Amino acid sequence: RNSCYTSSYRQPVSLVVEWVLIGGLAMQDKLHEIRVFENFQEELFETGHVIVTTEVVEKSLNYFGNAHGGYLFTLCDQVAGLVALSTGDYAVTLQSNINYLKAGHLSDQLKIEGLCVHNGKTTKLVEVLITNQEEKILTRATFTMYVTGSISE
């Protein structure tokens, strides 16, 4: 057991971590390794604009057979970092937000496109879209990147 507080009411909340049987299978049987950028292609790398493509593989699916949300988020986060690099700076994710709009499926061809909409000295704001081969938007994400140094230094 672990105690934590909710942010709004400061009431203690108990968290219990234990293996739960679901349909006769332990929860650990539902967990598996997720692969990201196993087969990516850099399509565009310009100042403030990056496009990477990849294919959804079996190792990137969730239990329901769709592209795992963590997989999609990681694709966005990696591209946001590449966008920061494209502006000449090293940066780390300071804050992020993602909206999942449609499911990705096995063998979908994904385009991950990042665009720097604010190129500041200490922070950058990067918008990232993931679209499929039908040009349907799967995710829309925003990343605030904190600049840790210049590539030229």
Residue positions per predicted region:
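Intrinsic-disorder-associated, low-complexity terminal segments enriched in Asp/Asn/His/Tyr and depleted
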Residues: 2-5, 9
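Terminal targeting signals and extreme-terminal segments of soluble enzymes
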Residues: 5, 14-153
